[in-house]
Amino acid sequence: ELLQIAKPFLTSGGHYLDIGANCGMTSFGLCTPQTQEHCTFHLFEANPDLIPILHETAQHYESFDLRIVHGCIASKPGTSRLCRRIEHTGAAYVGEEGDVAVNNLCLDDYIAENKIERIPLAKIDIEGFELHALRGMRDSMEKGRVEAVILEIAPPWLNRQGHRPADIFEFLADTGYRCFFFRSDDPNRSSESARVEVHGTVLHVYPVEHAHIEGQTDVIAFHESAYFQ
């Protein structure tokens, strides 16, 4: 379902940020004939064990513009310690007890250094560290360069970092975004749906009406300047 909702955003080209790329399933799944010529994929991954896997898989997509970046997407420069789980590489998280130090990367700096003007979509799934990533991209978000964001909301993982779902929603509202649930089976969604047109495709989404989240879910946030003016 995530791939289906992400595809329309890239039909007009631009840069896709995959923050917490893991093995690259989302990015490689979006490598289609429609995105081959006009899209650049930026795959950010903190776990050093996954970087060789991403490079190996990328060899099968040589006609696509894929950029694999090793680093911990954070709100400030420095280093973070990463707690790795051998049995589940995608569940690595930032914590003081981490066994490996990873250099931090602030997305505002990366976006400026690479002269990126338009990001139709960013996906963020970094095991509770999402708010740090958002804070490190605040300037780009406030300016509307990031037109939409899909991110995981997992209360236990957020709590591990001292954050709540409400903190995420407040940040997104402050930077000019409206948040929606999009999974058809999401128990958090309201009965009232909304229609948002993305480059000719109509998405049926459900407004986030409160910050109490049941279980683990994903939300999509649209910048008002791109979709509501």
Q: Where are the model-predicted features located?
A:
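Phosphate/nucleotide-binding beta-alpha loop and adjacent structural elements of enzyme active sites
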Residues: 1-229
